Amino acid sequence: MRTMWWPCLVLALLSGLETSGFPRSPLQLLGKRSLPEGVVDGIEVYSTKISCKVTSRFAHNVVTTRAVNRADTAKEVSFDVELPKTAFITNFTLTIDGVTYPGNVKEKEVAQKQYEKAVSQGKTAGLVKASGRKLEKFTVSVNVAAGSKVTFELTYEELLKRNKGKYEMYLKVQPKQLVRHFEIDAHIFEPQGISMLDAEASFITNDLLGSALTKSFSGKKGHVSFKPSLDQQRSCPTCTDSLLNGDFTIVYDVNRESPGNVQIVNGYFVHFFAPQGLPVVPKNIVFVIDVSGSMSGRKIQQTREALLKILDDVKEDDYLNFILFSTDVTTWKDHLVQATPANLKEAKTFVKNIHDQSMTNINDGLLKGIEMLNKAREDHTVPERSTSIIIMLTDGDANTGESRPEKIQENVRNAIGGKFPLYNLGFGNNLNYNFLETLALENHGLARRIYEDSDANLQLQGFYEEVANPLLTNVEVEYPENAILDLTRNSYPHFYDGSEIVVAGRLVDRNMDNFKADVKGHGALNDLTFTEEVDMEEMDAALKEQGYIFGDYIERLWAYLTIEQLLEKRKNAKGDEKENITAEALDLSLKYHFVTPLTSMVVTKPEDNEDQTSIADKPGEEAIAETTTMSFLTTQQSSQSPYYYVDGDPHFIIQIPGKNDSICFNIDEKPGTVLRLIQDPVTGITVTGQIIGDKRSNASSRTGKTYFGKLGITNAWMDFRVEVTTEKIILGTGAELSTFSWLDTITVTQTGLSVTINRKKNMVVSFGDGISFVIILHQVWKKHPVHQDFLGFYVVDSHRMSAQTHGLLGQFFQPFDFKVFGIRPGSDPTKPDATMVVKNHRLTVTRGSQKDYRKDASVGTKVICWFVHNNGEGLIDGVHTDYIVPSLF
């Protein structure tokens, strides 16, 4: 699948603390050699953690910073975080010496009095303000007594929007001092499956710091971790200042087996729509460019550079023109022309000669462009199946001709008549951005600020690339009549390649059996309808595992999207309509605890024995041996080194220091099913196993004993694989295959790999020093009426496998804990029941036994274990069917 890289919705963070007497810029705490390491003016920031959890594009982010005042006097400590302008703060808590002071979201007018009182008394109040292009800065401070500890925790949520084929989270990291425990931990869960995941940091300039960054994805789950030690943070081996200063970016995309994807949880649904492979709809585009005097110098030069680059990307099926406005209006051509090579060459000559002139006549420039597009359509000089777009770039306010904003809005609205979108690009800060935004929103477009930086030309090019490839026009998303409530926006003038349409709503009947969604649109060749049908029972089963992120995510996603769209509509509303929209958005903001332009978060904390109020305020609008099913066993015994295996009917055993007990469970699946046992994206190692039954079993039966009859081991980085059956072993390196039988005794080696076959007993597969597997052959009498040969799989060394290792066996490679209590008689007097707490689940378990065949393949060693019922539910991550794969390789 094609993955396009593009700046997207930004998640930014700046976390830190500063003391009184230091500049109030974020985290400007410089290390001093005369002080203990990590302590600045008596304040030690000993922990900063950014925890990001994303489920179906909806991000839940928690920023936690902990500090201690090691001075002998009280100190003021400040907490600064930069977060995306598109995010809503949902919680802020302040904990001092174990006492937590929570935040409460209130209507802005109610909170304002508390805010003004705090400021008038000279107290520091928390606030949120704009910071850079895509960020807002949250700041709050508090006095901390000598020897006291303080914890700041900020939570915010946002919907990641897809641009140019990817979702992006961008974190601004600037502690500017060494932090004993600094960690970024991001977990991503996408039911469609993750197709790519990457992470990078601008400040990682050496291998030592780079080794602190790990990233992996498998199936539906992705993980990024950045956890540098103190030494890895240092700018030099003996320095006390930090390298952590710059941008940390995570990007990912999802699999798209169909154009749409619908997810339903607890009566709320979200519908993602992003078709691929459609032909591009030809576009008719007019660029309306401000060439007034204020555009002189660098601005006009960057505009020329951007337009020349855009002309390189215009497709030959497109039609275009340029309109320049200052006091007067001039055009390149009298009408739209096709983007032939000759016309593009002429257009570049025109662009190179653009220069600044005098005043700013926005009204006439826009009306001329609109007239040109309307006439081209009326005269049929552009393709019937094409779409029109107008893009205006200006750096100031109208000051000649019609200069009243309301009148310009009326003129443009009447001229366009809803037929095509207007996109406004505001260059710099000396302009009425609210006017440009309103003008665009009224005409199905959007506004974007172009910042006066060295990359302004790239910003202009970037915006054009967003709208360069329309795949559908007049998109309508439809659902069964009377089946839904509270639907978010479901009509869009365009769908652009690399983007995504998101619609959410509420079901009238939560017990409905199926759900259908239709998306209709005009394509380049014909009208298209995309239908997505959902079986509710299958949906419930597929989404069970999502609770490990946060269970009500679809409802919160719906609320977020609804509020966001209401606030956008509010900008153009008037009178009663505006009041009604405001009331609805306010109610939702309060209900779901979102800090929006209509609400504020109030935190009351102690300050010199008085209450102090802080405000988080968002800127405004700008039996187990006899079982007949597959059994899995985990064992923990403190006296031995960790080992892991699956054997018998098959038993999974995991041994971890610190416990002297075992856990086991069964998987009830039919013969022929292939299960993923181990998958490590870092080492590239994957192990799978195919189930066989006894001789009475058939492919559709889940009764009778089951075993592993075939195993597959691959190492993607070495281009190596081995297929093991009860009859033969096939080794493959690249395109070369070698076949051996269990009658052989042989060792095969190459760099980083060793395979040893011990005749009729076992084989050992080792990947260097630190990863070693043993496969045991179990043979029975060939004429036995029921039993047949099977395999056992043992991990005898796994210490070089990464923390991202997963699978039915691999997920237990990392330490975990469980507690057993409440032992009581069970239904079988010889097998008591008990309550087990493991992985935040409370389970009923039963005492039983399994076998360890490492020392004696015929008899085995008895292992006592606690049996987890229902296919290991609550013990394994997700459900057992998540580990079923189509084939061995």
Curated annotation (Swiss-Prot):
<feature type="glycosylation site" description="N-linked (GlcNAc...) asparagine">
    <location>
        <position position="91"/>
    </location>
</feature>
<keyword id="KW-0654">Proteoglycan</keyword>
<dbReference type="InterPro" id="IPR013694">
    <property type="entry name" value="VIT"/>
</dbReference>
<keyword id="KW-0722">Serine protease inhibitor</keyword>
<dbReference type="InterPro" id="IPR010600">
    <property type="entry name" value="ITI_HC_C"/>
</dbReference>
<feature type="glycosylation site" description="N-linked (GlcNAc...) asparagine">
    <location>
        <position position="580"/>
    </location>
</feature>
<dbReference type="Pfam" id="PF08487">
    <property type="entry name" value="VIT"/>
</dbReference>
<feature type="propeptide">
    <location>
        <begin position="650"/>
        <end position="889"/>
    </location>
</feature>
<dbReference type="InterPro" id="IPR050934">
    <property type="entry name" value="ITIH"/>
</dbReference>
<dbReference type="InterPro" id="IPR002035">
    <property type="entry name" value="VWF_A"/>
</dbReference>
<dbReference type="GO" id="GO:0005576">
    <property type="term" value="C:extracellular region"/>
</dbReference>
<dbReference type="InterPro" id="IPR036465">
    <property type="entry name" value="vWFA_dom_sf"/>
</dbReference>
<comment type="subunit">
    <text>I-alpha-I plasma protease inhibitors are assembled from one or two heavy chains (HC) and one light chain, bikunin. Pre-alpha-inhibitor (P-alpha-I) is composed of ITIH3/HC3 and bikunin.</text>
</comment>
<comment type="similarity">
    <text>Belongs to the ITIH family.</text>
</comment>
<feature type="propeptide">
    <location>
        <begin position="22"/>
        <end position="33"/>
    </location>
</feature>
<feature type="domain" description="VIT">
    <location>
        <begin position="29"/>
        <end position="158"/>
    </location>
</feature>
<keyword id="KW-0165">Cleavage on pair of basic residues</keyword>
<feature type="modified residue" description="Aspartate 1-(chondroitin 4-sulfate)-ester">
    <location>
        <position position="649"/>
    </location>
</feature>
<protein>
    <recommendedName>
        <fullName>Inter-alpha-trypsin inhibitor heavy chain H3</fullName>
    </recommendedName>
</protein>
<dbReference type="GO" id="GO:0030212">
    <property type="term" value="P:hyaluronan metabolic process"/>
</dbReference>
<feature type="domain" description="VWFA">
    <location>
        <begin position="284"/>
        <end position="467"/>
    </location>
</feature>
<dbReference type="Pfam" id="PF06668">
    <property type="entry name" value="ITI_HC_C"/>
</dbReference>
<keyword id="KW-0964">Secreted</keyword>
<dbReference type="Pfam" id="PF00092">
    <property type="entry name" value="VWA"/>
</dbReference>
<feature type="signal peptide">
    <location>
        <begin position="1"/>
        <end position="21"/>
    </location>
</feature>
<keyword id="KW-0325">Glycoprotein</keyword>
<dbReference type="GO" id="GO:0004867">
    <property type="term" value="F:serine-type endopeptidase inhibitor activity"/>
</dbReference>
<dbReference type="GO" id="GO:0062023">
    <property type="term" value="C:collagen-containing extracellular matrix"/>
</dbReference>
<keyword id="KW-0732">Signal</keyword>
<keyword id="KW-0646">Protease inhibitor</keyword>
<comment type="function">
    <text>May act as a carrier of hyaluronan in serum or as a binding protein between hyaluronan and other matrix protein, including those on cell surfaces in tissues to regulate the localization, synthesis and degradation of hyaluronan which are essential to cells undergoing biological processes.</text>
</comment>
